[in-house]
Amino acid sequence: MSRTGGKRPLEFPKSSRVVRSSEFTKALRRGGVAANDCLVVFALPHDVPDADGEPSPDESKTVKCRLGVTIPKKTGNAVVRNRWKRLIREAFRLNQTQLPSGFDYVVRPKKDVTADWKMIEKGFVKLVGRAVRRSQSSADRSSTRS
């Protein structure tokens, strides 16, 4: 809450986060993928069913898009990993109004890359757009096979 009593326009509430392990796994296995020199982004539409054929029960239709961040231990010590998380979350928070809605995004850094705000900020929105297009094209291919 801001001092004026209204909600902050650019926030990152828990409802905007991918938190369950099954949601991460689903996005990593079935989502569209895009990468650049420092980040890998996976995008998966909210309405993709689980293995049992049902959409996730707790996914709200009011959520525009959600972010999950996964930082492998090979990335560095806790200080380095937490810096990556902060920078990726900030890039999402500042650009969430520009991102396609209805998707879960899972982001991870590439190995042996130093966290640089300019690189993350510049590439984040572009990678999300590319991952969404790939996710949609793979969904189109799988629907024609059925």
From Swiss-Prot:
Q: Could you give one GO CC term from the UniProt record?
A: ribonuclease P complex
Q: What is its EC number?
A: 3.1.26.5
Similarity comment text for this entry? Belongs to the RnpA family.
The reaction(s) catalysed by this protein are: Endonucleolytic cleavage of RNA, removing 5'-extranucleotides from tRNA precursor
Question: What is its quaternary makeup?
Answer: Consists of a catalytic RNA component (M1 or rnpB) and a protein subunit.
Q: Is Transcription set as a keyword in this record?
A: no
Provide the organism lineage as a comma list.
Answer: Bacteria, Pseudomonadati, Planctomycetota, Planctomycetia, Pirellulales
The record's InterPro entries line, in alphabetical order, gives: Ribosomal_Su5_D2-typ_SF (IPR020568), Ribsml_uS5_D2-typ_fold_subgr (IPR014721), RNase_P (IPR000100)
Checking Pfam families in the record gives: Ribonuclease_P
Q: Outline what the protein does.
A: RNaseP catalyzes the removal of the 5'-leader sequence from pre-tRNA to produce the mature 5'-terminus. It can also cleave other RNA substrates such as 4.5S RNA. The protein component plays an auxiliary but essential role in vivo by binding to the 5'-leader sequence and broadening the substrate specificity of the ribozyme.
Q: Which organism is it from?
A: Rhodopirellula baltica (strain DSM 10527 / NCIMB 13988 / SH1)
Domain of life assignment: Bacteria
Please give the Gene Ontology molecular function terms for this protein.
Answer: 3'-tRNA processing endoribonuclease activity; ribonuclease P activity; tRNA binding
Q: What class of enzyme is it?
A: hydrolase
The protein here is known as Ribonuclease P protein component
Could you tell me the Gene Ontology terms of the biological process aspect for this record? Answer: tRNA 3'-end processing; tRNA 5'-leader removal
Q: Which UniProt keywords apply?
A: Endonuclease, Hydrolase, Nuclease, RNA-binding, tRNA processing
